[in-house]
UniProtKB/Swiss-Prot annotation:
Record function comment: Translation regulator forming a complex with MCTS1 to promote translation reinitiation. Translation reinitiation is the process where the small ribosomal subunit remains attached to the mRNA following termination of translation of a regulatory upstream ORF (uORF), and resume scanning on the same mRNA molecule to initiate translation of a downstream ORF, usually the main ORF (mORF). The MCTS1/DENR complex is pivotal to two linked mechanisms essential for translation reinitiation.
Skewed-composition ranges (Basic residues): 95-109
SUPFAM superfamilies: eIF1-like (SSF55159)
UniProt keyword Phosphoprotein present: yes
Ranges annotated as spanning the membrane: none
Name this protein carries in UniProt: Density-regulated protein
NCBIfam families tied to this protein: DRP1 (TIGR01159)
Compositionally biased intervals (Polar residues): 72-81
Protein keywords: Acetylation, Cytoplasm, Initiation factor, Phosphoprotein, Protein biosynthesis
One example GO MF annotation: translation initiation factor activity
Cell compartments where the protein resides: Cytoplasm
Amino acid sequence: MATDISESSGADCKGDTKNSAKLDADYPLRVLYCGVCSLPTEYCEYMPDVAKCRQWLEKNFPNEFAKLTVENSPKQETGITEGQGPVGEEEEKKKQKRGGRGQIKQKKKTVPQKVTIAKIPRAKKKYVTRVCGLATFEIDLKEAQRFFAQKFSCGASVTGEDEIIIQGDFTDDIIDVIQEKWPEVDDDSIEDLGEVKK
């Protein structure tokens, strides 16, 4: 008896999924992909450029856009109050949406573009050369560190956010080397501080 019940219930479950799937859609399925984010149009709302996706959909497929706006309209009607705009939009802006890094914000350049070179004494007659400010010219510090180490045949390391320490006294040569390698760094933006204590 127990085996008969489980078999019949198992057959019903399998039959239900097949029947419901056939009723909902025609096979083969035709999926509409967004021209902006390349996802199906149902998933565009989870991307950072929702406005661009909606504009593309409205321009290329106005009837699909109308279906989407009709589906979303009950949510918006509940958020509208008298004398105010839609509250739902404000709440959407406050909440973080999933999917991607979001919109990339441009960094504001408030730091003046200046490269400073200083000679710092170590032990006895040994010196290190400190180069600061290369990052303000959008120069990769790791690449610059490798270049200095290879050019001067010495050790070099990135120590701070915008600081490279080169083992040895290269204050005379380094100005010319920087201008050869990175022409965007002009002579006026390089300042030699001379010998500086730690």
